[in-house]
Amino acid sequence: MLSFGVTVLPDPPWTRWLELIQLAESHGFEYAWTYDSHVLWQESIPTLAVAARETSKIHLGHFVTNPATRDPTVLASSYATLNDLSDGRMAMGVGRGDSAVRYIGRQPMKVADFESALTMIKEFMNGREVHWNDKDLQLKWVR
């Protein structure tokens, strides 16, 4: 069966953003996405946390986030926390950081760096240990 989702722009006020996500859920949409360009729109991690608690069925996530503006360890921890808050309803759309990074005067990640960051994020999200910056790291609380 085909899945349907909606992208809701994270413009103020966040209460209207939440209303639109709740409306999508009430109409049977399976996914609600939001953007992650931290200078262009409101910060989306806290609003996704609110949506996780104020909805019960719809899957939530970024369309897209990136490991160029969000450190991969922070991104993995944030999504693991959001996934816990939402009872497993988080979905991560992830890219190299084109618009978010260009807007602040930087270049998107190189493909090899993106692949490395994505591998690390996936390992963290699955509770596995990651060797990074000469350290063995793990999100030990991830279920």
What do these predicted ranges mean?
Residues 2, 76-143:
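Internal, glycine-rich beta/alpha segment that forms the wall or movable "lid"
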Residues 61-78:
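Structural motif corresponding to the early beta-alpha repeats
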Residues 13, 71, 110-114:
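Residue-level preference for long, well-ordered alpha-helices that form the structural scaffold
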Residues 19-21, 46-49, 74-77, 106-109:
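Short, glycine/charged-enriched secondary-structure capping and boundary segments
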Residues 59-65, 91-95:
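A short, GP-enriched loop/loop-strand-helix hinge that lies immediately N-terminal to
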